[in-house]
Amino acid sequence: DVLLEKIVSQSDTQAGTKSIRELEKLRDDCLVAVMQGLKSVGFGAGEVLAKYENKLFSGATPAPTNIDQPIEVQRRFITADWADYNGHTNDSRYMQLSSEALDVFFRSIGFNSDYLATGRSFYSLESHVRYINESKVGDEIVVTAQVIALDEKKVHLHSVMSKTDGTVVATAEHIYLHVDTNLKKGSPIGEELLVRLAPIAKAHAKLAKPDGVGRFVGQSVK
């Protein structure tokens, strides 16, 4: 009885004024952080998670259907391991969020493990992130992708990261070069990708250029 009372007392002290739901959320956030940490070193449950994510990458991703507007490619909640010392989403996570979301876009046009196995891939040439508003743990972020330009070897993509109420928290633009991974040099984008990518680029060319496209670091804000 003494031991039980001590455990209850210590648990109450640790919980403080948090509700059961808040404690459950904290538990889940901690578990996610541990899983992501283990994934980075490929150990235990993290190894299982990494294999699962690789399997998702290898699987088929449906081709975009409504291409007459920026394409929603991903939604995710901001977890505790993404927060910085200010309590906001760490700036590096917006680059990660954009990069991972555009991976989904690439998979939707047929860029998967089978394509990689042919010795062809995309390499990043340039990226630029703009931080517009803050986001915090628990916020759901929606990422859309828009093709800004496309040529024989390069594709210029722009992503917008917004809260579900439409508040834009960040934007990013990236230029990717299609490469022959054996020769380590640029090469034409495969026809099996262009059959999906070219119509999207044509449709997006009719859209207004997103705010901030082409900006450089240090450029004055009007």
Regions found by a protein language model. Give the residues of each.
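Charged, low-complexity interaction regions
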Residues: S11-I20
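Core beta-strand residues in small-molecule sensory/regulatory alpha/beta domains
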Residues: I132, V160-K163
